[in-house]
């Protein structure tokens, strides 16, 4: 997968048909929330002239027991050992509203379109300018275009 020229590798565990060479899409989703939280924490610390040494974000998640498959709960813990106690509430407020967290709190409209072109182009998955395009060759997905 390519994102703004960067290459991300995504895979599945062996029991799920993958080779377990990279994180799963769900793990990348959770990492996205954690990294957004980390970014906002860093910006807060920088803005207030506080040390960035030591802050870390841990993300724990649980999958739903019922269908459809989805993340049922997500818990983030921000460790900021050098943060003065009087700034804890402010940091919590800032990191609770990172862009990814805001998106989860107010879910976007999501539509999935399936297209079939006469000759599907082999194209890597890409995220560009807020637009996601993904295509795979029909032989790779097992789908065939009507002729």
Residue positions per predicted region:
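Extended beta-strand/beta-hairpin segments
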Residues: 1-31, 41-147
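Alpha-helical metal-binding/catalytic segments enriched in His/Glu/Asp
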Residues: 36-37
